């Protein structure tokens, strides 16, 4: 029964009693084509066929970000630190602070550039603790697509990330082919994926 069409409890009860929205003879093996096999009995055959096509994993790689173990020390608002200590471009050895995507409200295409991170200290053994996860150093500063891991009930907004590092609050996708980058971000922000 698909009772989500009922506006209130009484309407849903009538849908149930009138046998409206009942899906008969649904082949449960169809669910195996959907990754993680959620029960989606209302999907048509054409929708189910889409799960057999190319997936986002075929054209992009997803990565989690940095866990500092002590955000009070490592993460600052950009206006809390001396501006000349912030690097806006990739560099090694690491500068005192680099731009940092921590997550936040949903903003399409660009945004959430409020933080800087003491990346140099993250690699210093005297600051190391068991809670630190430094992430994939090769993905630091690379052009990526990011979104907020947590948020309200509104749809996720995918935005451009470049020349910064990301925390776990901003998971990222890296296009395997750089020419696909804008196609991916446009697709993910479309009504098709929401």
Enumerate the predicted regions with their spans.
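A short beta-sheet element
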Residues: 148-186
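Glycine-rich, charged/polar anion/phosphate-binding loops
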Residues: 130-132, 157-158
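Polynucleotide-recognition surfaces of large bacterial nucleic-acid defense/processing enzymes
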Residues: 1-128, 134-144
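Residue-level signal for pocket-adjacent positions within structured domains
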Residues: 105, 114, 153, 168, ...
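Short, intrinsically disordered, charge-balanced linker/junction segments flanking boundaries
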Residues: 150, 189-194
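Alpha-helix boundary recognition
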Residues: 102, 188-189
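A short, charged
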Residues: 138-142, 182, 187
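Residue-level signal for threonine
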Residues: 44, 166, 190
